[in-house]
Amino acid sequence: MGEKLQFTELDQYLFGQGTHYDIYKKLGAHPTMRGRKKGVYFAVWAPNARSVSVVGDFNEWDIQKNPMQKTGPIGVYETFIPEAKIGDLYKFYIIGYHGEEIYKADPYGNEAELRPGTASRITDISSHKWKDTTWMKHRPEFNEKKSPMAIYEVHPGSWKKHEAKDEDDPGFYNYRELAHELAAYVKKMGYTHVELMGIAEHPFDGSWGYQVTGYYAPTSRYGTAEDFKYMIDYLHRNKIGVILDWVPAHFPKDAHGLANFDGTAVYEHEDPRQGEHPDWGTKIYNYGRPEVKNFLIANALFWIEECHVDGLRVDAVASMLYLDYGKKDGEWVANKYGDNKNLEAIEFFKHLNTVVLGRNHGTVMIAEESTAWPKVTGKAEDGGLGFSLKWNMGWMNDFLEYMKLDPYFRKDNHNKMTFSMTYAYSENYVLVISHDEVVHLKCSMLNKMPGYPDDKFRNLKAAYAFMLFHPGKKLLFMGQEFGQLREWSEERELDWYLLKEEKHQDLQNFVKTLLHMYTKYPALYAADNDPEGFEWINADDSYRSIFSLIRKSPTKRNNLLFVVNYTPVDRPDYRVGVPKKKQYKLIMDENGLLDKPKIFKAEEQECDHREYSFNYSLPGYGVAVFTY
């Protein structure tokens, strides 16, 4: 073809080994120069294709005009097209292994046509001029084990919406608008991070972004790749970290996507018992194939290094770890040892986390893992998977079951609130109340609470207070901070009008107070992984459904004593055991921060197996926070 090839022998070797971590800078579509000619370099991996060409706006989608050249045995095709330019739509036209004609979007494309269109769009992903220098300079210093993490989980398409211009207008905010409104709200509330759902390009709104076709493309629903980078940049300049949902567990069968990419199983396993999720109707990646592993690991690095994202929340980890996940007998293939562990996925996680965290100090890899798989956050070299943090699904299930109970029955389920402390230090945990808990007839957080409307609000405040004082980082899905009544739907914005009502505003202010307290007091975060940082005062007062505990600061200053009542019964003379004979300052109760702290002096009266104690008038559903 005459032009200088960009995919070198070294590229071939590294890609074949699964260690070409910058592969996205070679594969895909890249505006560049050939001598004095401006144009676009295209490269795609299609190992079993008979031929590949590029079709697009620049050649009137003519399959004959721009054939690609196969560069070597690994199966990468490439070409340079002077007529192609930024903004043009394109696809790869493939004659498959069996002679079939296939049109595919670019697996490494950085922008996509707005759905229902399925083409890729040429862009210059490196054109953004970053202004988050201060954030990035200090990012390597971040230590998630000793730092506060209060994460606001957000679905960008439904957090807020514009009024629709017509029936086809979804009213989405642009990434830039989101940046400004989100930053202002998150800062005001006291969150430290946002976790964004559905950023990678996906064809179906109702999948919430969990069936991805464009792993390297921020979804065009909210603007361009440049707009997306602006949002990250702006959030960083406002001292807000950004975590993305990331889905390496499976991919959809859409014709333009990764499935049967060149007429054969390229990204997935060929055997449907290994390559299909029957429950989800999706394909499973072949984690043992170096080029596939490379595609995914480089994708994680793309978001973190190219887009400055601060961490990834890895979806559906359990589905990757178990070969029989969601499958009946005969629908799966055992590993070489005859059991159900996916050895290739285990090695993939170790490789992924070692590379991502090794190259990017101060970032986090978070596992959504719903089983008791050991050492999810253990070091890879010690046999762990190497994640930074793991969602604490066990705590969440027990906590929500308890909170949904009528207060009369809580005394018989007291252990649901205490059991999590028996394993709290087995992993590095995030306590989560995610989008999954407020959909599919599960009710919003407010409507999970028992009783009349007033009781629901009081219960929810007590619930959030307990969550804040339990060891672990925090995640709360959008809308639950102000008492969203309806379940979440991706089709409509949150019910912000509820904030015109005093009770919703009061709940929002209470959550805001909790979050600002969380970031102010190291006792609440600096010893999350140290058993010395937590002490039950009374974990056994099941009859009255009252819990009392202490969170300790590593400096031994500004420790916090927390008491909560999960019945509507007032306890005017509730005696609390304390560790020392000193003054305890009440700084917050169920109504929020006190204008002036109240002093309680410990007396030499035994209570809760402690030498000292004091009396406190604890209201029904009351919360009390003391510092000492």
Name each model feature, range by range.
Residues Q69, F204-G209, K253-N260, T377, ...:
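Short glycine-biased active-site loop of nucleotidyltransferases that positions the nucleotide triphosphate
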Residues E101-I102, K160-H162, H202-D205, H250-K253, ...:
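Short catalytic/ligand-binding loop motif for oxyanion handling, primarily in non-cytosolic enzymes
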Residues A217-R221, K336-L343, Y452-D454, L498-Q505:
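A short acidic, glycine-rich active-site loop
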Residues N174-L178, D227, E291-L296, K341-F348, ...:
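Soluble or luminal CAZymes and related metallo-dependent hydrolases
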Residues M1-P148, R176-V186, G190, D454-F457, ...:
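Carbohydrate-interacting/catalytic domains
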Residues H308-D310, K328-E490, T519-N529, G533-V576, ...:
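Conserved alpha/beta catalytic core and glycan-binding cleft of carbohydrate-active enzymes
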Residues E113, M136-K146, H155-K341, D608-R610:
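Substrate-binding/active-site clefts of carbohydrate-active enzymes
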